[in-house]
């Protein structure tokens, strides 16, 4: 593990060994809250990736035939080690990502839950059998692992998203090559250390740090059979098209613009609490963030009054400090991009209720306070595009029909939420909203690991979603056997 006090150079994890990249290139990994250099991550090349894939391919010959209960026992041990190191993992998340320690602690919990699901997944790997499909003939379906799987993960959930991928893939008998975000590489290396301690054989999990060369290498390598990706919409589309053209199974989870509809009969205090947490938690850098509030009818004025008050009370600072809610964004470049969106929102006619650019926290960190817009319309850029930052837009409409129509105009469809006490409104919302994950009176309707993370439209590219039974389907292939006895 890197010495965080000296900014030590990180290494790739290939074949159970920590190895230097052949490229000789590195990139600094700063703490977003302080600018302090935590480590230097290698920007690996194709040769590094080829070595990892070759090792994973060789390891698959044994791991793919390892009895399922034995694989599950390694995962149960891994889960135990993650629990024992919970606080350390949460601190690492905060150091390299910037989110508050409380949120990081919750992220580690979600990652552990993914490992728990993977450890218990053998019951979902069972096949099916039907005797006597004809006289003295029986037929059965069996599941087999697919081989070497590649995973490409983002900076915003350095614990949870990798744990969506490699534990379940490995439980299903595959081997794995992970390319974590070069912005948050520390947590990935620690996950590999703990998995090795749990008894995972060499070569089953490999980590290659880097950027475009490693990504393209995974997408094009003939020995990589499937790709799981989480990231922005343009990159997700590229990953899906490129990997598909090279004959791979692909799931690519993309961007979002999640809408929250607030009805006049809603519990406003509860709605505001949920919306503020969903919009500004993790600095808005998550694909389930609340990005747009749709205020229906006469609820708009009292809702705006309560929202403004709640947003003004948000505490900003280093995520390791007590009582901090909003940490920094990931990099200075992302801060500047977000500030440009805020400026554009003003120019296009939105009402800037609270300007996060005016919050003075620290000149060394990448801090941006919570921003709140009112009177946003669907013609504005800040409504159309994913900002991925602590910016919330409020749109005013007159009816639930109008709110649903507006929400469905978005090219993204990860999630949507409704705040109401009326069952008829819930039923209408549930049936008519074109999005994959819906919340009723809660702000982040992300499912547990045993359900699929089911984005729609331009929020997802592929057929089988991450997690749940979809995940098992994605990481296995079926073989039909028909026999006469």
Swiss-Prot record:
Pfam families: Aldedh. Keywords: NAD, Oxidoreductase. It comes from the Bacteria. Gene3D superfamilies: Aldehyde Dehydrogenase, Chain A, domain 1, Aldehyde Dehydrogenase, Chain A, domain 2. GO terms for molecular function: malonate-semialdehyde dehydrogenase (acetylating) activity; methylmalonate-semialdehyde dehydrogenase (acylating, NAD) activity. The keyword Plastid does not apply. The keyword Lyase does not apply. The active site is at residue 287. One of its GO terms (biological process) is thymine catabolic process. InterPro entries: Ald_DH/histidinol_DH (IPR016161), Ald_DH_C (IPR016163), Ald_DH_CS_CYS (IPR016160), Ald_DH_N (IPR016162), Aldehyde_DH_dom (IPR015590), MeMal-semiAld_DH (IPR010061), MSDH_GmP_bac (IPR023510). Its EC number is 1.2.1.27. Pathway: Polyol metabolism; myo-inositol degradation into acetyl-CoA; acetyl-CoA from myo-inositol: step 7/7. Transmembrane segments: none annotated. Homotetramer. HAMAP family: IolA. Catalyzes the oxidation of malonate semialdehyde (MSA) and methylmalonate semialdehyde (MMSA) into acetyl-CoA and propanoyl-CoA, respectively. Is involved in a myo-inositol catabolic pathway. Bicarbonate, and not CO2, is the end-product of the enzymatic reaction. Belongs to the aldehyde dehydrogenase family. IolA subfamily. This is Malonate-semialdehyde dehydrogenase.
